[in-house]
Amino acid sequence: MQGSVTEFLKPRLVDIDAINPTRSKIVLEPLERGFGHTLGNALRRILLSSMPGCAVTEVEIDGVLHEYSAKEGVQEDIIEILLNLKGLAVTLEGKDEVFLTLAKSGVGPVTASDIQHDGDVTIANPDHVICNLTTNNSEISMRIRVERGRGYVPASSRLSSDDDERPIGRLLLDASFSPVERIAYSVESARVEQRTDLDKLIIDMETNGTLDPEEAIRRASTILAEQLDAFVDLRDVTEPEEKEEKPEFDPILLRPVDDLELTVRSANCLKAEQIQYIGDLVQRTEVELLKTPNLGKKSLTEIKDVLASRGLSLGMRLENWPPASLAE
């Protein structure tokens, strides 16, 4: 392993130990000293707080007005039922939200498999217990809202001014959208040839079953890499301000020749030649103007002097004249 003293090692051994379908240990080595904690902490934070997923966000239970109620014939109180609903592991295909229904009666447990849903919804833990019915006459019916989101969103942050009109009995839940339920990492020493000061990163992660640990690590790494891309080439990524377009022509050229305040004789001669704007006039030469009926050298001298006082002259060339703004 010979290379430049400034060259960084890249991990070349990734070992994935699948403990069960939802839990894996992922080993990454060798890493430069200190990089184990740098990468481990960054990935851990992303996996816990920034992974997208689906979660129950609200529920309506027949006969229940608020979360501090108790329902006859049901072993759990409403708060316990809400906590159990938060444990549902759900995925949505092609939708951002769905409403699911659950209705059951008789003695026995009520599980996630009792929830009615279509093919766009997958429940990864169908044996998850929601509540237990205690008598033959017991029954429970509820409407469950599942949404797609990211990270952890408390119910209080979804309250709005319209909540005064929210139907009584619609209960909001704190939503944990991340499919990662538990993650821990440790850093051990690694050795490559004569170097013994390297790191080995070990990530122990468990998901809710909607996403396998290997894919979760892959997605978290992609998120981290995309966020760091901006630092690879430090540039101002803000939208450049639109520069104010300069006018194509000097505004004085767009003004009518009447603004030159010529004598009546000179002004009438120009009107007879359909010279309406100063931009029309400055493009004419002295020879062309002298051919105008009734316009003599005295009028020509007057026109030249008036134009000169405004920084203009005869015989000017104007590209793309007349502008579209003058078109009738």
Swiss-Prot record:
Xref: InterPro entries: DNA-dir_RNA_pol_insert (IPR011262), DNA-dir_RNA_pol_RpoA/D/Rpb3 (IPR011263), DNA-dir_RpoA (IPR011773), RBP11-like (IPR036603), RNAP_asu_C (IPR011260), RNApol_insert_sf (IPR036643)
Listed under GO biological process in this entry are: DNA-templated transcription
Q: EC number(s) for this protein?
A: 2.7.7.6
Stored SUPFAM superfamilies? C-terminal domain of RNA polymerase alpha subunit, Insert subdomain of RNA polymerase alpha subunit, RBP11-like subunits of RNA polymerase
The answer on whether this UniProt entry bears the keyword Nucleotidyltransferase reads: yes
Q: Where is this region: Alpha N-terminal domain (alpha-NTD)?
A: 1-235
Q: Which terms are listed as keywords in the entry?
A: DNA-directed RNA polymerase, Nucleotidyltransferase, Transcription, Transferase
Q: Which reaction does it catalyse?
A: RNA(n) + a ribonucleoside 5'-triphosphate = RNA(n+1) + diphosphate
What Pfam families does the record tag this protein with?
A: RNA_pol_A_bac, RNA_pol_A_CTD, RNA_pol_L
What Gene Ontology molecular-function terms does this entry list?
DNA binding; DNA-directed RNA polymerase activity; protein dimerization activity
Give any Gene Ontology cellular component.
Answer: cytoplasm
Q: Which SMART domains does this entry report, sorted A to Z?
A: RPOLD
Q: Where is the region Alpha C-terminal domain (alpha-CTD)?
A: 249-328
Domains (record comment) = The N-terminal domain is essential for RNAP assembly and basal transcription, whereas the C-terminal domain is involved in interaction with transcriptional regulators and with upstream promoter elements.
Report the function annotation for this chain.
DNA-dependent RNA polymerase catalyzes the transcription of DNA into RNA using the four ribonucleoside triphosphates as substrates.
Note the subunit structure.
Homodimer. The RNAP catalytic core consists of 2 alpha, 1 beta, 1 beta' and 1 omega subunit. When a sigma factor is associated with the core the holoenzyme is formed, which can initiate transcription.
Q: Which family does the entry's similarity section mention? A: Belongs to the RNA polymerase alpha chain family.
Q: Quote the protein name from its UniProt record.
A: DNA-directed RNA polymerase subunit alpha
What gene name does this entry carry?
rpoA
